[in-house]
């Protein structure tokens, strides 16, 4: 009964947040693929966990200070099985949505930082073009509030440890759940999960890589699971 989301694509077999990792997630039958987005200097939405290219690319730059063409001059040079992927480039939001559509996978898009909220309509337009129904997630409640004015898609407020305030914030946005750190014991030591469920909030957990952690969450009725490596049983 578990709904599995591949964290940054299937990063256990291919470099994270790339066309390769998203395609692998699709081939392995994941319900969703999670990604992180930034906007380039010339207005192209691209996929990267970090605001700069230092960790994953062969040249270092801040994404929002470079044009898409400048970023395409770089290659991905880090990540699992990188040797298999020569000339792997930064992935655009369009490429990611195209892969999600091809594999009937739900796009799970993290709205990073607090910049560029005035351009969120571009994201919604792209999703509409590809006829996909994304889930939007963010650690910043304001980002979700802005996005809610543009789309009725499902949303989750990302938190480390669930607080009473988080419950109220999520409740203030229609069709918004809470996606919490499922490895933090404090989330299980109080009745906070029950309070979320009593408030009618859907819950998800991240980043779950151990089967026992998964089983614990299932006991609490939490079935939306973001993972680096857990797969559906063959």
Segments from the language model and where they lie:
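Phosphate-group recognition and catalysis centered on beta-loop-alpha active-site segments
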Residues: 1-234
């Amino acid at each position: 009964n578990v709904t599995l989301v591949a964290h940054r694509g299937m990063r256990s077999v291919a470099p994270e947040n790339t066309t390769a990792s998203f395609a692998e997630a699709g081939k392995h039958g994941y319900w969703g693929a999670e990604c992180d987005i930034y906007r380039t200097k010339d207005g192209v939405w691209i996929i990267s966990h970090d605001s700069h290219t230092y960790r994953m690319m062969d040249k270092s730059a801040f994404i929002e200070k470079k044009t898409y063409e400048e970023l395409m001059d770089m290659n991905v040079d880090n990540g699992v099985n990188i040797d298999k992927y020569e000339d792997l480039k930064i992935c655009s939001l369009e490429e990611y949505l195209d892969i999600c559509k091809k594999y009937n996978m739900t796009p799970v898009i993290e709205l990073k930082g607090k910049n560029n909220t005035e351009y969120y309509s571009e994201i919604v337009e792209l999703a509409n073009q590809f006829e996909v129904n994304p889930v939007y997630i963010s650690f910043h409640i304001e980002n979700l509030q802005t996005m809610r004015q543009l789309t009725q898609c499902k949303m989750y407020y990302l938190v480390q440890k669930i607080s009473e305030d988080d419950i109220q914030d999520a409740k203030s946005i229609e069709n918004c759940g809470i996606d919490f750190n499922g490895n933090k014991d404090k989330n299980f030591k109080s009745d906070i999960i029950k309070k979320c469920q009593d408030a009618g909030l859907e819950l998800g957990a991240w980043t779950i890589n151990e089967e026992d952690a998964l089983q614990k969450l299932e006991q609490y009725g939490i079935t939306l699971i973001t993972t680096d490596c857990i797969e559906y049983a063959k």
